[in-house]
Amino acid sequence: ILVNAAVDGEQLSDDEILYETLLILIGGDETTRHTLSGGTEQLLRHRDQWEQLVADAALIPGAMEEMLRWTSPVKNMCRMATADTEFHGTALREGDKMMLLFESANFDEAVFGDPENFRIDRNPNSHVAFGFGTHFCLGNQLARLELSTMTRKILQRLPDLRLADDTRLPLRPANFVSGLEKMPVVFTPIKPVLA
């Protein structure tokens, strides 16, 4: 599709195809993977909420939104001011670049009240894990479907899943998209799906 795509009648350059492919791979895989692992970690650290989900799958949509808020897989995004303006007392000139910190926004006390508490019943949950405005993630519905499906399957297949220990889990070093490096767990094996 990208090889044959055209913008204003011009085909994409090799570099544009490469960058779009990387964007699709990062946006369509890494972010969802990091949300699932980081969100699962929080559910396992808040055992009461894990047990609620095991007992009632109808709670998964709220849990998924809290997983997105908590993990904020895309840490930041740069934007350029399109006009002179003032932002919280700071003058910005047209062309100035600024970095938006999604993780900071998702832990804003003015928005979330108790942002440091992981709560699957948080409502409303006005997180910006998918960005906002004209830059809102086009894949947000696919990501939500993937997250809810995977979370449901993990809860069904591994209801007694636990972290191997209480040590802090290492994060993958990155300044744009980040998540857990590894997450040792223990569980009781069940009969394989495909025997």
Show which residues each predicted segment covers.
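Cytochrome P450
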Residues: 1-195
